[in-house]
């Protein structure tokens, strides 16, 4: 049995359209069910984030993403930023769900909020390329508007550094995945997230104001 049954139950609805039950006609009951699933999954994710944040009390929790977007499209891949020191415009940590109901997990990343960015956010973020990287940490880079995964190798670090200098890469995140669908215990998940944090702290520090 999954440790995160609400998330597992909600993931198959990725991309579905939600209609307000009062306007859904014959779909009223199914919309009420979707809303309940979304709210339960969001709470389950938020509770995990709170447990993680309690291990790092100096991090400030931002708000968990909603279970649907403004266009009322269901959005099960929740995320939650955790602000360290500095301004809200600067890179920080974030936890983000990924995967399908059959194989899902949470990634810890160093990134910034696009809606809060200023003229320095990108240059600070891309300092993550200044440090050597080691798997299982990896890069998630935005090239021509498309985000792509790059394994954590020196070869990829050099490649992305060159692409950044050439203006081909806009933004580079550093991420570390922790599986949830097959996790044996919550303690195991939190322990693996602590390993992820240990791996990513140097990259976070690299983004700080020099």
Whereabouts are the PLM-identified features?
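Short charge-dense sequence patches
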Residues: 1, 70-79, 143-155
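Long, solvent-exposed, polar/charged low-complexity segments
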Residues: 1-56, 149-210
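Compact, glycine/acidic-enriched structural inserts
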Residues: 36, 104-161
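Short N-terminal edge-element motif at the start of the domain
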Residues: 46-76
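Short, surface-exposed, charge-dense and proline/glycine-enriched linear segments
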Residues: 62, 85-99, 137-143, 169-174
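Sparse, context-dependent recognition of short Cys/His-centered cofactor- or disulfide-binding micro-motifs
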Residues: 63-67, 78-82, 91, 157-163
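Aromatic- and glycine-enriched beta-alpha-beta binding-site module
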Residues: 70-132
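Generic structural hydrophobic/aromatic packing signal, biased to beta-strands
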Residues: 80-82, 106-108, 139-140, 172-176, ...
């Amino acid at each position: 049995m999954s440790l995160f049954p609400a998330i597992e139950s909600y993931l198959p609805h990725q991309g579905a359209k939600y209609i307000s039950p009062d306007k859904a006609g014959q779909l009223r009951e199914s919309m009420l069910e979707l809303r309940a699933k979304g709210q339960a999954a969001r709470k389950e994710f938020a509770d995990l984030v709170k447990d993680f944040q309690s291990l790092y009390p100096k991090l400030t929790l931002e708000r968990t993403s909603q279970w649907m977007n403004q266009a009322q499209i269901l959005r099960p891949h929740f995320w939650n930023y955790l602000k360290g020191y500095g301004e809200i415009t600067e890179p920080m940590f974030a936890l983000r769900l990924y995967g399908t109901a059959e194989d899902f997990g949470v990634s810890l990343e160093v990134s910034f909020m696009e809606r809060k960015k200023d003229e320095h956010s990108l240059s600070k973020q891309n300092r993550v390329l200044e440090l050597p990287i080691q798997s299982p940490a990896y890069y998630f880079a935005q090239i021509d508007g498309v985000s792509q995964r790059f394994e954590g190798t020196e070869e990829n670090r050099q490649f992305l550094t060159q692409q950044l200098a050439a203006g081909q890469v806009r933004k580079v995140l550093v991420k570390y995945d922790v599986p949830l669908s097959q996790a044996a215990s919550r303690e195991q998940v939190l322990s693996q997230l602590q390993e992820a944090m240990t791996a990513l702290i140097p990259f976070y520090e690299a983004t700080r104001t020099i």
